[in-house]
Amino acid sequence: MFIEIAGILGAADLRLADTVFAQKDAFESGARTAGRIARAVKNNEQAKPAGLAADLTMLVEKRLMKNDVFRAAARPRNFIRILLSRYTQGMAYGLHSDDAFMERQRVDLSFTLFLSPPESYEGGELIVEEPAGERLVKLEAGSLVLYPSATLHRVAEVTSGERRAAVGWIRSLVRSAEDRETLFDVALALRQAEAAGDRALTDRLLKIQGSLLRRWGED
């Protein structure tokens, strides 16, 4: 399942991001954390995991865990890693899929949380390969795209400006992408039943959701 979620970060959060990205000597080559194959096609910079950058990654995790849509779509067991990345003119990230394991944990989902307004840079689209063709993603600052980590994707070359983002990898409580999508559909139906005040249907859907989580979920 491929899903976009708007408004993960607010104005104050984005101001903190601006402060982090304005720091001198706070960034290093992004190739350091790439897998063996991806390292050859990765050309960006990422923040060193300390100080304000560490504060921002913790804030991103906190905001995501408070977002109902994100939790329903990802069913996160834990965040394996969150990095702050930037691309300036001439930088890009070639076609790749994310590692199956990071830090001895299975990687199920990846996300890109955009931190700079789309009009502030040219190029830099996240390009995802799908059976029907390529999907280009370039969202408003504070908005996120979530997708299975096995997806082939790349970042187009930035031709002007600076593309800023937080990228992260998640181990889900539910291994299968199809099962996560089914649970997401149940969560949407549950929200609709609650909004309609249909207590009987709400209880029935809660039972179904619980049964599916017991069947598909992992401790």
Swiss-Prot record:
Residues that coordinate or bind 2-oxoglutarate: 163
InterPro entries cross-referenced by the UniProt entry: Oxoglu/Fe-dep_dioxygenase_dom, PKHD_hydroxylase, Pro_4_hyd_alph, Pro_4_hyd_alph_FE2OG_OXY
Domain Fe2OG dioxygenase residue range list: 78-172
UniProt entry keywords in alphabetical sequence: Dioxygenase, Iron, Metal-binding, Oxidoreductase, Vitamin C
Annotated binding of Fe cation, by residue: 96, 98, 153
Gene3D superfamilies in the cross-refs: q2cbj1_9rhob like domain
Signal peptide: none
Pfam family name, one: 2OG-FeII_Oxy_3
Keyword Iron: yes
Gene Ontology biological process terms from the UniProt entry: DNA damage response; intracellular iron ion homeostasis
Cofactor note: Binds 1 Fe(2+) ion per subunit.
Requisite cofactors: Fe(2+); L-ascorbate
Source domain of life: Bacteria
Broad enzyme group: oxidoreductase
Molecular function in Gene Ontology: 2-oxoglutarate-dependent dioxygenase activity; iron ion binding; L-ascorbic acid binding
Enzyme Commission code: 1.14.11.-
PANTHER family: PKHD-TYPE HYDROXYLASE YBIX
Protein name from the UniProt record: PKHD-type hydroxylase Plav_0037
Organism: Parvibaculum lavamentivorans (strain DS-1 / DSM 13023 / NCIMB 13966)
Species lineage: Bacteria, Pseudomonadati, Pseudomonadota, Alphaproteobacteria, Hyphomicrobiales
